[in-house]
Amino acid sequence: KIARVIPDLPEYKGVIAISFTNKASDELKRRCKQRCADTKQSFFGTIDKFYISQIIIPFSSHVTGNITEYEIVDNIDESSKYALLLEEPFSSKKESILVEGLQEGKIFLKYTGETALYILENVPGAMQYIKARYSHIIIDEYQDCGEIQDKVFIKLVVEWINRNCCGRYKSSNIWFYKTIPKISDCSDEKR
């Protein structure tokens, strides 16, 4: 699918190709480069890598008002001021803690989806950038997406142009999205 799309794109555009592991992303990129040598401005990587490199780092300064260097925080100490993030469910209080973390240069790996969604909803330039740079988003094994990935995907679907989700057809998410005309399911296509 990706190799059919890329040749028709202008040099400044690419596709977003999301896989769930770095190994799968590397393999997908390798296969695409075999079929079309120039992948242009395409992104190949995991969903977290996409959130961090294409949404959070470039646009968090629009939320925080300052530019800082970021560290990825894998674990949250239960005694830290960020411990509320460990409680369920996600809330507006947690959202403000994520923003506070960004102000202090912290990106919480477990909450990259929530952080990216917050930025997409509050920084118009983030969605404009995604639309300007990428023509398609293709998510491999979409049935393995969690709730927050699903929300981000819906946000992109509502405001964007071309999308494909690859996964098992009978999966609940894929089945649901067959009813949305903007989404195509490539679960039956050869990869």
Report each predicted region and the residues it spans.
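P-loop NTPase Walker
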Residues: 1-60
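Active-site flanking residues adjacent to catalytic metal/cofactor-binding acidic residues
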Residues: 45, 139, 167-169
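Conserved RecA-like helicase ATPase core segment
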Residues: 152-191
